[in-house]
């Protein structure tokens, strides 16, 4: 994931004890700004039309429901030895900032880049070197604003469910209730 790659690059060279929290960014997907009632009758085709990333159908649906962000919370816990309380999700519709790391002193480092998975893949394959390839670069002069918003947990219950499972710990993400449905999650 570009988010975890971004976190790794931001924390590299810093002590774990200096880390206050991380902020995973989410574009909000095609349904950003809509409330739960307006999402009742959406069609699968609508969910696959991501506004900033070019992805396959399943990943696009996971993004549209914010389920992917929930899974990224669990991943970040294990990859970076963080508690669920140290992981926040913020909606960033421009998808320019891939994640942010906040330190105990209040400083925040952000990883910025174009929406192209070639960059995090290149970094992962060539680390610790930095290899230059002819790829599109981020042009800071074209950006007019970078905005952030809190996620709407009632409109996107998958994110609430994943956060609940992360806090429960263990194998909670794999557990089901007796009737086979996911447990009711407070939002």
Q: What are the residue ranges of the model-derived segments?
A:
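Catalytic, metal-anchored helix/loop core of enzyme active sites in primary metabolism
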Residues: 1-187
